[in-house]
Amino acid sequence: MGGSHIHSPQLDALRVALEEPLDRVQRHPVYAAVTTVEDLRAFMEHHVWAVWDFMNLVKAIQQRYTAISIPWTPRGDATVRRFVNEIVLEEESDEHPVGHGFCSHFELYVGSMAEVHARTDHVSRFVANLAEGLGFEAALALSDCQPAVANFLATTWDAAMAADEELLAAFAFGRETVIPVMFDRILTEAGALGNAGLLRHYLVRHVQLDGDSHSEMAKYLLTVACGDDPLRWARAGVSARRCLEARARLWDAVGDMVGAR
């Protein structure tokens, strides 16, 4: 896809319809409110859950648009397969920035939390429970995460289980469109990143990846999935709005802790 921009009347209309929730997330005061190490810890202890559940969207898309079972057969469009597998490669096994081989972005983020002595026990226990076979809902109920975090995770989970257009809208507008803007604002406005080298790397890496071809390819997938079906576009809009509203509520919760106004 390179740096090309995807255009369709329906996609353009959806962009317009989502301007308010997009603006609320992208202009949220929480980014500039992270001025102390304590603020940064609070931010990361909330945000790490979103880093984890990004992979639910990625893996749901991989399951639907690539062949991951045997006997193997070619599945779908090869360009789409390439895009999806590139995202999986980068998110699940990217190069570690300080020469420690490879790691997922979630593992990198958890490592960055250690740099600022943020708590990781809640999310680590949650992931360990999942690894031991506990279902998502049960693990979430035992996680002790904040209500805004639980709402965010449940919203993403619902999108990952929903129709293709709802999944792809959550990915395209709930993640790939807003992440570069959010992370760029944190990099430029947050005043507490001095000793958080791994976090800075994580943020810069996502601005690079999501701000380039990922966002446009995600919108391309959404456009193909919806076609000219107005009901699919309507469902996509509802899904994207729900995800953006859940993100805004997550940032509201962090803002309440760090004094964002």
Across the structure, where does each feature detected by a protein language model lie?
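Non-heme di-metal
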Residues: 2-261
